[in-house]
Amino acid sequence: MKKFMMAIVAVLFAAPSFAQYSSGGFSLSESSVYYGLRLGMNMATLTGDDVDAGTKVGLNFAPVIGLRVSDTTPIFLESGLYFTGCGAKKDKASISLNYLEVPILIKYGIQATDDIAVLPFLGPTFRYGLFGGKTKIPGEGKVDSFGDDKFKRADVGIKLGCGAEYNKLYLEAGYQFGITNIANWQLDNDDDASVHNGAFFINVGVNF
């Protein structure tokens, strides 16, 4: 957690230098394609059957690309390849679910000032579980989070939120919720269990 916070601080200190180096301010009327980097955190949890979970902090990191899809209105399509940490934690027990994530977001740009743009967004996100995710059970040690009688690797969700850009610096916050049932086990009555991802997130970054 300490290393993660140091990384966030480093981005915040480095970003003004990048923005000062970059020529000109942001203009929705001039932007057709942009590239960017995102770094931030999830405040993730799990909801559903057999889950009594609190919030777990996870990492977000991604390169992204955005494309303007209309010449007459500031509508953008943004995607990227995220490493994102989800899961849940309560007391000494924890569930870590690490994913590669590809969102497909529709963003609408609102030019607030010459240098500031506000961009609300909404879209689906597609995730696949990576190796390294562990479930920690007190007294039983750690086991893999994905597999039979555990969690499914594939997940589809919805991501929504709002971003703001100032001189190429970018800040966004929002919420993502899973549509897919990621539980890969049955309840005591032989019914399929139902568990879904959910997370508030905040990211900082740059667009160029």
Name each model-derived stretch.
Residues 20-64, 207:
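Short glycine/proline- and aromatic-enriched beta-strand/turn motifs that initiate or cap beta-hairpins
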Residues 1-29:
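Cleavable N-terminal export/targeting peptides
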Residues 33, 41-43, 64-135, 200-208:
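Gram-negative (and chloroplast) outer-membrane scaffold detector with strong preference
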Residues 31-33, 53-59, 96-102, 116, ...:
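Residues that define the transmembrane beta-barrel architecture of outer-membrane proteins
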Residues 20, 47, 127-179:
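A generic hydrophobic-segment detector
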Residues 47-52, 89-95, 132-141, 183-189:
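Outer-membrane beta-barrel translocator domains and adjoining extracellular loop/strand segments
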Residues 25-27, 49-53, 92-94, 110, ...:
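Outer-membrane beta-barrel proteins
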Residues 76-78, 82, 86-92, 147, ...:
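Predominantly the C-terminal beta-signal and adjacent terminal strand-loop region
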